[in-house]
UniProtKB/Swiss-Prot annotation:
Biological process, per Gene Ontology: protein modification process
Active site residues per record: 24, 77, 93
EC number(s) recorded for this UniProt protein: 3.5.1.122
Function: Mediates the side-chain deamidation of N-terminal glutamine residues to glutamate, an important step in N-end rule pathway of protein degradation. Conversion of the resulting N-terminal glutamine to glutamate renders the protein susceptible to arginylation, polyubiquitination and degradation as specified by the N-end rule. Does not act on substrates with internal or C-terminal glutamine and does not act on non-glutamine residues in any position. Does not deaminate acetylated N-terminal glutamine.
Protein name (Swiss-Prot/TrEMBL): Protein N-terminal glutamine amidohydrolase
A GO cellular-component term linked to this record: nucleus
GO MF entry, a single one: protein-N-terminal glutamine amidohydrolase activity
Length: 204
């Protein structure tokens, strides 16, 4: 595993994480489930972070699927945020080539960069949902990963679809960056950087 200098030894190791390509929301849900089952006292320190915008076109750098140094343009992406009063904030992203986890400042600087030099159509917003709430409310029947003939566009995870007590499919409510919809808090990238990262990065 990769570990950033000065970073505490994480209990989540990339090779131990359940991962399915192109199902980032479920990968993060499974990370939250692992924390709940193995370190429940830490669950309140973690949040799922959905990254998207109104156009569902967001650039993210340092992705494993990128060609060269450029960004990948996703319709949305999901990462896990760890807020530690002792060690600082860290990001877990199973699709990045950055260390796992990465200090939040490093992830913002290297993977998200800033919106000031990006066309307005591609500017990112982030919905932060506490891990406990995410585990209780998220549901996906994976219908967004089927084509018009009901064939899978990407192979699904090996476990059953995730359901909540209220729903079998509410992914769009998490991807939406309308603060009146869904759960958690919606931030601009600058506001997210101010809240969770180094404030000097927000304006650069």
């Amino acid at each position: 595993m990769e570990q950033a200098a000065g970073e505490p030894s994480p209990f989540l190791v990339r090779s131990d994480c359940l991962y399915t390509s192109c199902y980032c929301e479920e990968n993060v849900w499974k990370l939250c489930e692992y924390i709940r089952d193995h370190r429940p006292c830490l669950l309140e320190q973690f949040s799922a972070v959905f990254i998207s915008n109104e156009n569902k076109m967001i650039p993210i750098w340092k992705q494993k699927s990128a060609k060269g140094d450029g960004p990948v343009i996703w319709d949305y992406h999901v990462i896990l945020l760890h807020e530690s009063a002792r060690d600082g904030n860290f990001v877990y992203d199973l699709d990045t080539i950055l260390p796992f986890p990465s200090p939040c400042n490093t992830y913002i600087r290297e993977a998200l960069k800033c919106d000031s030099n990006i066309h307005c159509d591609f500017r990112r917003k982030l919905r932060v949902v506490g891990a406990h709430e995410f585990l209780q409310t998220f549901a996906s029947d994976r219908s967004h990963m089927r084509d018009s003939s009901s064939n899978w566009t990407k192979p699904p995870p090996p476990y059953p679809c995730i359901q909540s007590a209220e729903s079998t499919m509410n992914l769009d409510d998490f991807i939406s960056m309308n603060p009146e919809v869904g759960w958690g808090t919606v931030y601009s990238l600058a506001a997210f950087t101010e809240r969770f990262g180094d404030t000097t990065l927000a304006s650069h």
